[in-house]
Amino acid sequence: MRYVALGDLVADCYYKNVGQDKELIKIDGGSSRFNVIANLAARGNSTCVISGCGQDLVGKIVLNSLMRLNVDTSFVIRKGNIRTRAYHLTVEGNKHICTKTCPICGNRTWYNQEVVTIEYYKKHIKKDDILILDGLKPENIPIIKTFPNEKVLDIGRIKRLDGLSNTEILNILQNKNIEILQLNETVEQYLIRRFKISKLLELFQILEPKFMIVTRGKEGADFVTQNHIIHKTLIHCQKEVDDTGAGDAFFSMFIQKYYENCKRISRGWIDETFLLANDLTTRVVSHLGARGHLYDGYYLKNINNCICKED
């Protein structure tokens, strides 16, 4: 059994304000599904990414960030005619502004067409792979519908849901192979309104996952299984530097413990796993970046221009 993330790789580029200018200070791997994989790999789980990226410096950094955690990157396609996808985050205290456009040169560093095709996935996904997916992006929907593998799915944004009818949402999410479905509070409330219901338990009954997690930020999380809701309250970190990736790390712990416990869920198991997940997220938010708790990261020196123009 291995955990597998699909889709093109993404970088997180961090900047700080220097007077009226921006200064690039750090580049690391990003995107929820790959952050989940990184956390799983750091704890010794078998992991793989089937992906694509550019042959640029950013792509090299993102690949190295996974390889140093022993993630299998054998099936990553690198193309020389693209720049690796990148989010640009300007850090101000413990807050950040995120764009897909370089704040130094103004270039958009995000291509929309996937490098990797579903046919490529079919060649390399094994029947017992557990697929890590985030969001209902167009490239994820056929994977959810057609691949028989067990899947864990995190939906953190409502943007993609707006373009789907209620019937389409149900056709995607009422999938017997979705083992764990994680939503944040915004998505939960959006779906409750969409389906004209009033309670989380009704939403669980409509979507029919094996196990549902609803994260509520600093208020903690709700866990739903077998028509029961268990609420857990977070123990807060005293030193919060950056909350990027906290939800991904939290999710990774529940994924791992779910399978280690042979998919058995109990109140005691939720209590125990929540303590481990809470401790992990406390470490995540104490560092800059989603993976700062896993390794030192790539703090750049001697780069006088923006990363978009490097050769």
Language-model-detected regions and their locations in the chain:
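Short catalytic helix/loop segments, enriched in acidic residues and glycine
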Residues: 19-38
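Structural motif
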Residues: 2-4, 129-130, 180, 211
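Hydrophobic anchor at the start of a short beta-strand
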Residues: 3, 46-47, 73, 150-151, ...
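Active-site metal-binding loops of divalent metal-dependent hydrolases
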Residues: 7-9, 136, 157, 249
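Conserved beta-alpha-beta core of the PfkB/ribokinase-like small-molecule kinase fold
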Residues: 130-202, 220
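Conserved N-terminal subdomain of the carbohydrate kinase-like
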Residues: 19-23, 45-130, 300-311
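Conserved phosphate-binding/catalytic region of the ribokinase-like
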Residues: 4, 193-311
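Positively charged, low-complexity intrinsically disordered leader regions
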Residues: 1-20
